[in-house]
Amino acid sequence: MEYKPTAVVAAGGAVGAVTRYALSVQFPGIWTIAAINVAGSLLLGVVAAMLGPDRLWRLFLGVGVLGGFTTFSTFAVDAVRHPATAVVYVAVTLVGALAAARAGMAAGEAWRHR
């Protein structure tokens, strides 16, 4: 195992997870998790499009920070726990995340090629 990439991912993951936790404490509820997942998808789209061969930055920001920031498991548990809003919650999260990732990639490409 390479220690430098592992440390970079761990540091980024700590930043992302603590940020998600702080937001969920400040703004409790399923819609905060939906917003976090959509925002994380947007930012990951930007990172994926903008960062070239710099492996450590991609690992820090993509796998670490944004991997720790977003959460599929909490999304799934929230959907099960809130059956009355589950369909809307799932649709908003999935469609929003896909649209945000696409928009982030387009923005990242535009920024990279300017």
Model-identified regions with their sequence ranges:
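Membrane-interface helix-loop junctions in multi-pass transporters/channels
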Residues: 1-114
